[in-house]
A protein has these predicted regions:
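Acidic, metal/cofactor-coordinating or nucleic-acid-engaging core segments within structured domains
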Residues: 202-205
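Ser/Thr-glycine-rich phosphate-binding loops at phosphate-binding pockets of nucleotides
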Residues: 164-170
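Conserved blade-register residue in beta-propeller folds
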Residues: 23, 171-173
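Nucleotide/phosphate-binding catalytic cleft detector across ATP-hydrolyzing
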Residues: 1-161, 178-193, 212-308
């Protein structure tokens, strides 16, 4: 089992997405609902500070500040529960490695760090097991960059990186393996925008709202076991969304004749299935845990530098 432990501290990367929370080994939806008593219909509830939380039944809506309510804190505790369960660890000292959209990090980094560090000791119960975590530090990194940090050496010449999550698209230009800090952008063009477009067009055709899960699975797989009158509408919406993404990239001076394109995040599958790349030099990073893994590596490198 691969993970980083430095001087007795577990390094735990958490990618706080609007659609999903991703760690090195676990992925779950970002929905959270609190109950005063243990819910009868689930065995997957998290018990924390006197309340039960059902995690992952839906997605969290887009917010421009992830520290504005309690949800992302509870989702962080849930991420610790699920990742530590996978690692077979019930008590540890931890360094949390997290991130924010590129254009938000300057204004929100310190507030998000304080938000996640407000309790040094976190005690919770998950699947009948008690856990105790001492938060030693929280390190905050830019999204997108973290997902490719292990392969920057492969980014020869001019490259453009598009990290398409559920809420935002983070775009970064990379030249000879070095990110260009003046050419980083965040846009509200995440996968949810595609699903909203798809749902509205399906509603006009069918007269009923297609379940979110059906739309999501269609985008992930590139097809669905539905009547053609529905899949044709869904395909058209996905193709239009893909065109919107490419239009935005061209605004950022993407030129396929001289640049390579790398697409990652949940939206990578949409472009892979529904965009005609016309011979563009494009690679898709389909590991949706890549960013969380990158956060861990960046945090490990920081810890090592502090000790030199």
């Amino acid at each position: 089992m691969e993970h980083y432990n430095y001087n007795g501290k577990e390094i735990i990367g958490i990618d706080h997405g609007f659609g999903n929370i991703k760690c090195r080994h676990v992925v779950f939806r970002s929905g959270v609902k609190a109950y005063d008593s243990e819910p009868a219909m689930t065995s997957d509830a998290l018990f924390y500070e006197g309340k039960y939380y059902v995690i992952g039944e839906d997605h969290k809506g887009f917010v421009s500040d992830k520290s504005q309510d309690e949800d992302y804190y509870i989702l962080t505790v849930a991420a610790l529960a699920k990742e530590l369960e996978f690692r077979h660890i019930t008590e540890c000292e931890a360094v949390l490695a997290v991130g924010l959209p590129i254009q938000w990090i300057g204004a929100q980094k310190e507030a998000f760090r304080k938000y996640l560090m407000r309790n040094e000791l976190i005690e919770f119960r998950y699947h009948g097991q008690d856990y105790l975590v001492r938060i030693d530090d929280v390190q905050v990194f830019p999204q997108g960059f973290a997902g490719v940090v292990q392969r920057l050496g492969d980014f020869k010449g001019l490259n453009i990186l598009a990290d398409i999550g559920n809420g935002t698209m983070n775009t970064m230009l990379i030249k000879d393996g070095k990110p260009m800090s003046s050419r980083c952008y965040t846009d509200k063009l995440g996968v949810e925008q595609c699903i909203i477009r798809m749902s509205n067009e399906l509603l006009a055709v069918s007269g009923f709202a297609m379940p979110y899960d059906v739309c999501e699975d269609f985008l992930r797989r590139g097809n669905a076991d539905l009547a053609e009158k529905y899949t044709s509408v869904m395909r058209k919406a996905a193709e239009e969304y893909s065109d919107t993404i490419l239009t935005k990239l061209r605004e950022y001076e993407f030129n396929p004749e001289i640049m390579r394109l790398t697409v990652m995040g949940g939206g990578a599958c949409i472009l892979k299935h529904f965009w005609n790349d016309d011979g563009c030099r494009v690679q898709y990073i389909e590991d949706i845990c890549a960013t969380a893994k990158g956060y861990e590596l960046l945090a490990l490198n920081n810890l090592k530098r502090r000790d030199t």
